UniProtKB/Swiss-Prot annotation:
Protein name in UniProt: Na(+)/H(+) antiporter NhaA
HAMAP family xrefs: NhaA
Keywords linked to the UniProt accession: Antiport, Cell inner membrane, Cell membrane, Ion transport, Membrane, Sodium, Sodium transport, Transmembrane, Transmembrane helix, Transport
Subcellular location: Cell inner membrane
GO terms under biological process: regulation of pH
Organism: Actinobacillus pleuropneumoniae serotype 5b (strain L20)
Membrane disposition: Multi-pass membrane protein
GO cellular component terms listed in the entry, alphabetical order: plasma membrane
Record NCBIfam families: NhaA, PRK09560.1, PRK09561.1
Length: 394
């Protein structure tokens, strides 16, 4: 179990560096003479036709709706594995990170709402600061990996996985559009087939790829966000086959490098490019970016730590052995690294109409500010609270 976590941490740490480079490249492209090339490339129309069925979308939407669906297959499999075999497989293991994750979703949303309560045009962005970017957060932890207790890494992993699950629920409930009953019917049939294949332990992954593609296309056409199809596919991959095979582990192992080193960096490059032309300090301090940034910088750590602390006081949960509340607070600050997941939700909240483009740019600036500040403060807090001398004193 520990070896698997160490491999995962190494992978995500490398991915975090690549994400940072991708975001910096996007900002350079968006704010130099290359900006026209960058934005026109992202708006290039790409169409797929199969008889009467067709999908015609800009390249940016293929990244956000298509490639990110593959990432959410991985998320679905990770959540399933942790629920059945890992750090969320019992009430005692799950309750502490679950309560922390709940606080990390509720309080940032409240901070954003409080700052934007008099601006109805911005209020659809309330979910943006709820998210945590696991790759970036683990990248920071990896910089101090020799002195960070294993239990603290497991806590962050469990919290982030529950956080992802919360983001999935929010996307399903609040960011779906007008429904197409025909497409939903096809999607429902595909889900029934996937569940049946899981029930009868069908291990041929090509079968899941075929039915999964049908599910993704029908969900895309239905008005529900297409990435949710990825989560469903991930959940339907069997943990064990009839002859002891482990299809979920094999697919997770195969997809993880592609998601870490291709899909997430591509998503970051496609979504982090914000033109600063016409931006002023007044705009940067306006309610939308301020609500997002403060939701991540203040709301996340306060929510994660406060809910954890109250749960311990009430006897609902116990602090995992080998770590202390000071270290929990350092991890809570790192949870303010929203980046890719926050960018994803911002695209859903403000990305559909042309009139929303300015709001989306402001939201992205808020995410970049919140992520940067949370990463810097979180790093130094984690470094201080995990010093061997302090850990012995605790």
């Amino acid at each position: 179990m520990l070896k698997q976590i160490q491999k995962f941490l190494k992978l995500e740490a490398a991915s975090g560096i690549l994400l940072l480079v991708s975001a910096l490249l996007a900002m350079i492209f968006a704010n130099t003479d290359l900006n026209q090339l960058y934005f026109s490339f992202l708006q290039t129309e790409v169409a797929i036709k199969f008889g009467a069925f067709s999908i015609d979308k800009p390249l940016l939407m293929w990244v956000n709706d298509g490639f990110m669906a593959v990432f959410f297959i991985l998320v679905g499999m990770e959540v399933k594995r942790e629920l059945f075999e890992g750090s969320l497989s019992s009430y005692q293991k799950a309750i502490f990170p679950a309560v922390a994750a709940l606080g990390g979703m509720v309080v940032p949303a409240l901070v954003y709402w409080f700052i934007n309560q008099n601006h109805p045009e911005y209020q659809s962005g309330w979910a943006i600061p709820m998210a945590t970017d696991i790759a970036f957060a683990l990248g920071i932890v990896a910089l101090l990996s020799k002195q960070v207790p294993p239990a603290l890494k497991v806590f962050l992993l469990a919290l982030a996985i529950i956080d992802d699950l919360g983001a999935i629920i929010v996307i399903a409930l609040f960011f779906s559009h007008e429904m197409s009953m025909q497409a939903l019917t096809i999607a429902s049939i595909a889900i029934v087939i996937l569940v049946a294949m899981n029930r009868y332990k069908v291990t041929g992954l090509i079968n899941y790829a075929i039915i999964g593609t049908i599910l993704w296309a029908s969900v895309l056409k239905s008005g529900v966000h297409a990435t949710l199809a990825g989560v469903i596919i991930g959940f339907c991959i069997p943990l064990r086959g009839k002859n002891g095979e482990a299809p979920l582990h094999h697919l997770e192992h195969a997809l993880a490098p592609w998601c870490s080193f291709a899909i997430l960096p591509l998503f970051a490059f496609s979504n982090a490019g914000v033109s600063l032309e016409g931006m002023s300090l007044d705009k940067l301090a306006s309610p939308l970016p301020l609500g997002v940034a403060l939701g991540l910088i203040i709301g996340k750590p306060v929510g994660v730590f406060l809910f954890s602390y109250v749960a311990v006081l009430l006897g609902i949960a116990k602090v995992p052995e080998g770590i202390n509340l000071k270290q929990i607070f350092a991890i809570a600050v790192l949870c303010g690294i929203g980046f890719t997941m926050s960018m994803f939700i911002a695209g859903l909240a403000f990305g559909e109409e042309e009139a929303s483009e300015n709001m989306l740019a402001l939201a992205r600036l808020g995410i970049l500010m919140g992520t940067f500040v949370s990463a810097i403060i979180g790093y130094f807090l984690l470094k201080i609270t995990t010093k061997p001398s302090l850990m012995k004193a605790a």
